Regions:
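Acidic, glycine-rich segments characteristic of secretory precursors and extracytoplasmic regions
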Residues: 7-59
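Short, well-structured active-site flanking segments
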Residues: 12, 144-155
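Short linear capping/connector segments at secondary-structure termini
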Residues: 17-21, 154-161
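Conserved, well-structured interaction surfaces
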Residues: 33, 41, 73-147, 161-163
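Secretory-pathway/luminal and periplasmic proteins that interact with or process carbohydrate-rich
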Residues: 44-50, 66-67, 139-149
Length: 164
């Protein structure tokens, strides 16, 4: 003899179906700080603030110069800003994509984080979000130095439809 039971009135939403928007809106301060740290990680993955990418960007701005010690030196392309450089150039493409990754991820945090009602805690949230604003601005600063005029994308929706 088999007995079965069921719970007809169960309306609990499965946690695996939480959207990115809901997740960001539910973040506590520690989670928001960790997400902002992820923006720094996006920069590190491209070696921007710490290694070769910063050198490339500074060559464009004439802050440093390169030594043409070998043929096909990537820095020569940055120094000369030659017209034959296209999006097919892997180095330029990587630079473009990684900075826009930082911009898009910063936009998600800035636009979807929900400030708590407690004024002290809200101030701490704003400080963390200030870092996201800064990193988005820094990314645009470097991109403008390299590529000139760019569209200003401030929302995730704009990034989905207008990614340059």
């Amino acid at each position: 003899m088999f007995l079965t039971t069921s719970c007809v009135d169960l309306t609990q939403e499965p946690q695996s179906f939480i959207t990115e928007e809901e997740y960001i809106a539910r973040m506590d301060l520690t989670s928001l700080q960790q997400a902002t740290t992820g923006l720094y990680n996006d920069l590190w993955n491209g070696n921007y603030g710490f290694n070769c990418r910063l050198q490339r960007i500074n060559v464009c701005a004439d802050d440093i110069t390169y030594r043409a010690a070998k043929a096909n030196n990537e820095l020569a392309n940055y120094y000369r800003l030659t017209p034959n450089i296209t999006a097919n150039n892997a180095d330029y493409k990587t630079t473009w994509e990684l900075f826009f990754t930082v911009i898009n991820n910063a936009n998600k945090l800035i636009n979807k984080a929900v400030l708590p009602e407690d004024a002290t805690l809200a101030k701490q949230y704003e400080e963390v979000l200030g870092e996201a604003y800064f990193l988005r601005g820094l990314s645009y600063f470097y991109l403008v130095r390299m590529y000139g005029d760019l569209p200003l994308i401030l929302t995730e929706e704009d990034a989905a439809t207008n990614m340059p």
